Amino acid sequence: MSEPEVIFEDWSPVCNINAFVEKSDACYYFYLWVNPQSDSAVVKSCWIGNIGNSPEELDIEAMGEGIAPRMPKQYVLHDEEGLDLDPDRFEIVWFEEGNAAALLYDDEIISVIPGWSGYNGFNGYARYAKGITPLAWGLLDAYDTISKRVEESKAFWSEFEEDFWTKAQSMHLAALESFFGKYEKYYAIDGGKFPPKALVRGSKKGVVYGITAGVSLIPMPNVDTVYGDEFKEYRRIELGFAVTEEKESLCNSVFSFMSGLAAFPWREDTFLAHGHTVPINFIEGFEAVLFISPRRLSGVETPEYKDYMGEKINLLWMVPVTGAEYQFITKHDIDENLSYAYDIERIHIFDGKSKFIGMP
């Protein structure tokens, strides 16, 4: 038996994920290799089709040896002689978040590895699979939902073929300058890579602000796992930090942290939201930042953004918290945590002091 051969591949536009199709003597498989060549690498797989006759039973022994097995006959929808696929007719459509993909053949969806692949024994969907199997679930059962996501993703990525950043940048700067006046500094934080991102500094009434622009261009992964049908309301974010002028010496270290954090959701295949925390080590006496959303907390100021691609942009203010507060916050829900805040309308403005009183 010859070694399997990679016959087609592509890379996610925003995540460190390699998508490829592998052909063996027995079958074709679609793979997503997440963070390849790293300690955190994960491989997601989905059967595409068999080559030659289909077996009566699943080859468990081959699976145990790491060999991609053929699908048993009772779960196969393609012809008995199997598939013979031309690599030049493949196309990969990345989902909007960049962490999931559909494989097309002659413009028809034949295999899909969505963001929820890997949970509860689910690998992905395949056009030629029937029912629920260990190798793939039947695509026909989910076709309406999946095909809609694929069409939306095609339209989404086509938006970036034009001079999109000039328009998006102008929208962000207009929102920020309406909030704090003429901006003072503009930092590119994308490292020259897609998507473009910036951090904009401004000030008003004795407070210095640093707010990102462009993080919201790409929706964050896996927001639907928490927000369900409302996930599109919360999957686009910008990050903000506000500090009194007396403490503005912190800005360089905080802005550097924000620059790295701006890529965090796509690097780690996760999302940031109201009530989440991230550890820090650059503000003495404080061990983490708590994210709060003005959309979820009445009275807290925010720039007023226009919708982007028909979706809301959510600013997340970063609120530094002490070690004891961090331990409490991670064990309780956000509403209970915020009940200890002593000045909710200025909770986002850091002055070197804790914003909470009386946390047990």
Residue spans for each PLM region:
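Short linear motifs embedded in intrinsically disordered, proline/glycine-rich low-complexity segments
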Residues: 1-360
